[in-house]
Structure formats: C-alpha cells, structure tokens
Design a protein with these regions (language model features):
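Metal-dependent amide/peptide-bond hydrolase catalytic core
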Residues: 227-441
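Electropositive phosphate-/nucleotide-binding environments in soluble metabolic enzymes
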Residues: 4, 8-11, 15-22, 39, ...
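Non-cysteine beta-strand/loop elements that form the S-adenosyl-L-methionine
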Residues: 79-81, 204-209, 361-366
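Divalent metal-coordination and catalytic microenvironments
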Residues: 28, 67, 80, 107, ...
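Acidic/His- and Gly-rich active-site-bordering loop/insert found
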Residues: 3-104, 108-133, 138
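Beta-strand segments within the central parallel beta-sheet cores of soluble alpha/beta enzyme folds
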Residues: 23, 62, 80, 129-138, ...
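Histidine/acidic-residue-rich, glycine-tolerant segments that coordinate divalent metal ions
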Residues: 92-102, 108-109, 121, 126-252, ...
Length: 441
C-alpha cells in the first residue's frame, strides 16, 4: 500500500473514533490526578491500548504505561508520549475537592491524542517499516515535593519527574525518537506551535538555622534566621545584572517557613527556589552565585544554612527535521500558514531531558482559552485539542516508518545526543548534593 493510502486509512479510522477520543479526553479532564498517583488515568490508557490489540507494560515508575505496535519488519521504533498528571489548581471549577488537582495544563489532551493516534495506527499493524510505542508517563508537574521525597526515601523512585524515571529504568532504550503535544494556553485558534524553546531548571530547598530568644525582652541573645533569609533574597536580586540576556536566567525563591511564634526570634527558616535558564551551563553558573548569596548572608548574620540541591529538568531542544515533518502534516489538516515557529516558552518540562538523549519534539497546540495552571484554563475547541493532534502525530509516524523506516533512520543517524543514558544519569547523580555553611544552633 502506498503512503497516501496508508494516511487515508489512518485518518478514516481516527474519524470513526472521533467521539470516543473526545469522550476519553473529557473523562480524564473530570478526574484529575497528581503525579505518581495517576492510577485511574493509567488504567484508562492501558485498557484502551489493549482493546486495540496493543500489549502493554504497566506500573512503570508506579503508574507509567508502555505499549508497542509491531511493524511489518524490524526497524526504527517511534514513540508517541503523553503525560498522565494534573497540576495543583484548587480554584479551578473542575478541581478535585480533596487534592486541589485540576487539568489546568491540558495533559488530558495528550493522553486522548496518543490514544487517538493509536486508533488510527492500529489498523496499519504489519504495514509499517518499524514499531510504534505508545507511552504514558507520570509526574511531569514538579509539585508535591515532600510526597515525592518520601517515595525516594522508600526507594520507589529516584527522580522527581516521570520521564527521568523512564530513562533511569531503561524503559526507553529501544526507542529511537519521540513525539508529543501540549496545550498552549490562550491560543484559541487552530494552530500548531513548532520548534519552541523551553528553559531548564534546578531546584533548591534551603534551611537557615539561628538561635531562639525572646523577641521582646532579649532579642540580642538570639540569632535571627529570618534576617539571614531576607538578606539572601536581597543578595540574589543584586546578581541580576551578571546574567546574560541570552541565557534567560530566572530565579524565584519563596519563604515556606518564616519562624514558629511571633515572640520568638526565628531559629528555623525554610526557603525554596528554582534556578532556570536556556542551557545547563548557564543554570549551573547562576546556581553557584545563588549558593554564594545564601552562604554569605548566613555568615553575615552568624546563622547556619543548609542547601539541598534537587535535579530539575533540562532545556528543551526540539529536532528540526521532526518538526518540519509534523508541520507538513499539520498544514494538511489545518491549512497553510497555520504553524507558529520558534517561540520561547520559559517554563520547563522533563521533555527537555529526552531531547538531550534522542530526536524529540514537543508541539504546542491551539484550542485553549485562559491561562496555564489557572482557574480560567479551558478547552474551547475539543476537536483541535484532542483529534487534530492525534491525526498529526499518526500521519507523522507514517512518514517516518514508510519505506522500511528510511526517514526515521536518517533522523536518528544525523542526531547528535548531548548525553548517553549512562552519562545523563551520572550528571544528575553528581549534581544531587547538599551543602552546609556555618555551625547553626
């Protein structure tokens, strides 16, 4: 069967399942689950794949799923990936009343689109020049850190992000390249946003330690850890002129505990911060400056400081050839000039980690109103949110795996990874460290 007929058969199958795809997306939207807890959504994903005759591996990194559709011959393995988790947005009208979880980032659309693509590609089993992997990953949103640290302590996970766990567990060793889509809040029209950039980040959990004393009668006997924290915020702010504009450094700390009682000099003060940037080199440089500010501020007050570094996510660098293929199929579906290219999205995603290991794209899609992670986030065009991405991904897979997968082979051959799996894990393992400055009290 020629490529055009394969594409027509695929689109016919997706159109036949259009209402099912939308219903899946809407059902997941109404039942949001937070990272590493996405039991219901994971079950929906695996059940749907198995109904299509696609065998699944379940329980990866607690809730992840990996299904595989075999090709006609051994060849490249192309992955379509979706994220299972919701974000914490308790004011959203569809938020879970107990957890505050809401699909205010549109990950429900990803799962529906991957399953929709599977519905289009399943009838092509044995007709493609390689395999298709359908993956559902947990925990893209970097939230509930205490819960995730408890999982680390129990040995259930090592990384905070689901894709990082997939890498650690070796689940992606047989995958040659990956595609996924993501909502773009505020883009209501039918557009695909291609080859966009996202920053990487690292996290810090900080504890300033001082000495308690009565804040009214004998404050001079104490050492005020809150003063050390406040001074560190000022010191970090004065670093801004040292950051290059091209590096897009963002540092945004918060104080999570300012003391215990108002009439006691604070002796235990907690902070958290991210350090973001467009390259790991820039992030690590800025991180060292932040650490100097933290340690210097503690020293000047006579306090102690503990700094725990948390592996974050790497910057996203999308494969340009994959992006062009997706764009061609997007224009087939939406019309000419419907692609938006090269926007800077200064949030972060663990898709960046995968882009350092394999050819990968993370296409943003229109069909959404409101703001990301906010109570006004909503899907205003359900066909654009759920069905069009399914079609675009499936058509791109056909392009990649037609003719014994020659296009996919070429993309993989020309890709230069920033890390191997081993060096990637070694990088983050070396980074995971803590620092202590001062004696504390």
């Amino acid at each position: 069967m020629n490529k055009e007929n394969l594409k027509k058969l695929c689109l016919q199958s997706i159109d036949a399942h259009k209402e099912d795809i939308i219903a899946l997306g809407e059902d997941i939207f109404r039942h949001p689950e937070l990272g590493f807890k996405e039991r219901r959504t994971s079950q929906i994903f695996s059940d749907t794949l198995e109904e299509l005759g696609i065998p699944c591996r379940k329980g990866i990194a607690r809730t992840g799923v990996k299904g595989r559709l075999a090709g006609a011959v051994p060849g490249p393995n192309v992955m379509l990936m979706g994220e299972l988790d919701a974000v914490v947005s308790p004011l959203h009208p569809c938020a879970d009343l107990e957890t505050g979880a809401a699909h205010a980032c549109g990950h429900n659309s990803q799962i529906a689109a991957v399953l929709g693509a599977a519905m289009g590609l399943a009838p092509l089993k044995g007709l493609l020049g390689g395999d298709v992997t359908f993956a559902a990953v947990p925990a893209e949103e970097y939230v509930e850190l205490e819960f995730r640290q408890s999982l680390q302590e129990k040995g259930e996970i090592e990384f905070m992000g689901g894709k990082q766990e997939f890498v650690r567990l070796g689940v992606l060793e047989d995958v040659d390249m990956g595609l996924m889509i993501h909502s773009h809040a505020g883009v209501t029209e039918r557009r695909f946003l291609l080859d966009c950039f996202s920053s990487g980040f690292i996290g810090k959990v900080i504890r300033f330690t001082g000495k308690e004393a009565h804040a009214g009668s004998r404050p001079f006997d104490g050492i005020n850890a809150l003063n050390a924290a406040a001074l560190s915020l000022l010191a970090i702010g004065t670093q801004r002129e040292t950051f290059r504009e091209a590096d897009r450094i963002r540092i945004h700390p918060i104080i999570t505990k300012g003391g215990d009682l108002v009439n006691i000099v604070p002796a235990d003060v907690r902070m958290e911060t991210y350090v973001r940037g467009m390259s790991m080199e820039a992030i690590l440089s800025a991180s060292e400056k932040v650490n100097r500010c933290l340690k210097g501020s503690a020293y000047s007050i006579g306090a102690g400081v503990e700094i725990d570094e948390l592996p974050g996510y790497m910057p996203l660098h999308q494969d340009k050839t994959l992006s062009r293929l997706f764009a061609e199929n997007g224009e087939r579906l939406l019309g000419p000039d419907t692609g938006i290219w090269g926007e800077e999205l200064l949030g972060s995603t663990d898709a960046g980690d995968l882009s350092a290991l394999m050819p990968f794209i993370h296409v943003s899609t229109g069909g959404y109103a409101g703001d990301a992670h906010a109570k006004n986030f909503t899907i205003c065009d359900k066909e654009m949110a759920y069905v069009m991405p399914a079609k675009a991904m499936a058509l791109t897979v056909i392009d990649l795996l037609y003719d014994k997968g020659e296009t996919a082979r070429s993309i993989r051959k020309n890709f230069v990874p920033r890390f191997t799996r081993e060096s990637y894990l070694a990088f983050w393992d070396k980074f995971r460290r803590g620092e202590t400055c001062g004696d504390g009290f």
